[in-house]
Amino acid sequence: MKLSPTFVFTILSLSLNFAATAVAAESCELTEADRAANANLSFDDFDQRGTTPTTSRKLGERECYAEAARASEHYLLFGPLLDQHQRTVVTWHMGQYLALNGDEETAARILAATRRQPVNADDTLDWNTYVIGTWAFLTKDRNLLRTASQKLSSAPGVGNTMNARVLQGLEACFEKPYRDAYGTTACMPAKP
């Protein structure tokens, strides 16, 4: 069976178009249309699940940290009105993206704004100590980081244990930038 040149050209063009679309989906570009689409997403779809390639979650997963921070900022301004917990989470992630992008000074100021009241009466997560510990790492206050890490290490609950390990990792790699210290295997303590 002989294929016509037109058929081959059409197939080749479609293949290249699909490849270009896949590359664009994996790029760090964040257009006005992307920001507008993000603004229509629920908190879960934007921040937790990252249902489209241009949500802050998906941009962050691709290490597009500056764009992830911009997407978060735009979402906070133009997305749905969020409750206190949701605003805190999006703001926290925006600060993390800035820190991962190397802007630890701005990140520290943003993360400082994420302290909060307990989510509910049964909330045992000592979020504020985690915030203070992370802020201490970003501002290079070793003593405050150590105090926060020790406090979380003795607090009950899985969330506190996880966050204590993160702070211990930041302590172990205190001289490194956040991008190299946060959650990396080389910095994290062994699981008990």
Positions of the model-derived regions?
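"A position-specific structural signal for the A-helix of alpha-solenoid helical repeats
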Residues: 93, 129-138
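Bacterial N-terminal signal peptides
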Residues: 8-17
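Residue-level signature for tetratricopeptide repeat
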Residues: 58, 97-98, 135-138
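TPR/TPR-like (Sel1-like) alpha-helical repeat modules
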Residues: 111-116, 133, 142, 146-158
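N-terminal alpha-helical interaction modules that lie
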Residues: 25-91, 149-192
